[in-house]
């Protein structure tokens, strides 16, 4: 075994004068490789859904007779939640942040034909093959005509 794999870096102890100077200045050390490898704490699911706690709810103030009341605001909020739940059940969850969510398209069954002009791959291969045969017979006829037009080889043979 080579000893190269067993090499590791050991950070030397910081001198006393540097540690005193950093303490006086208020220096904080930046992120290291070890701090970047640490797992971040997971965010609560409540924070993603908005402010659900009562103390975080918006305050409703009615100044005029036609203003929105607290009860009406709660009804609207319930309608929005129901609409989000129904859209998630439909398979199209939309983000409230406005972020675009990418998802794999649903696979189509071979039985379901979307367009009447679409044919199977076997038919397409057969038609391409017949087209090639037709064009190849035409191209050989053109090559015969063109060979008589250019007769450089014939002149060399005559000499």
Curated annotation (Swiss-Prot):
Biased composition range(s): Acidic residues: 45-57
InterPro entries per UniProt: DUF4604 (IPR027911), KIAA1143-like (IPR040219)
Superkingdom of the organism of origin: Eukaryota
Compositionally biased spans, kind Polar residues: 135-150
Annotated segments matching region Disordered: 23-68, 80-159
Transmembrane stretches, start-end: none
The protein's name: Uncharacterized protein KIAA1143 homolog
Organism: Gallus gallus
């Amino acid at each position: 075994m080579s000893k190269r794999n067993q090499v590791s870096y050991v950070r030397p102890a910081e001198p006393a004068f540097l540690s005193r100077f950093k303490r006086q200045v208020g220096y904080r050390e930046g992120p290291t490789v070890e701090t970047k490898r640490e797992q971040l704490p997971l965010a609560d699911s409540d924070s993603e859904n908005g402010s659900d706690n009562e103390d975080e709810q918006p305050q409703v103030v009615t100044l005029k007779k036609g203003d929105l009341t607290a009860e009406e605001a709660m009804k609207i909020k319930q309608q929005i939640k129901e609409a989000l739940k129904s859209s998630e059940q439909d398979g199209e969850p939309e983000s409230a942040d406005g972020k675009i969510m990418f998802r794999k398209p649903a696979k189509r069954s071979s039985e379901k034909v979307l367009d009447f002009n679409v044919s199977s791959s076997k038919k397409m291969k057969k038609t391409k093959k017949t087209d090639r045969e037709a064009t190849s017979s035409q191209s050989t006829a053109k090559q015969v005509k063109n060979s008589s037009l250019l007769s450089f080889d014939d002149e060399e043979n005559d000499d």
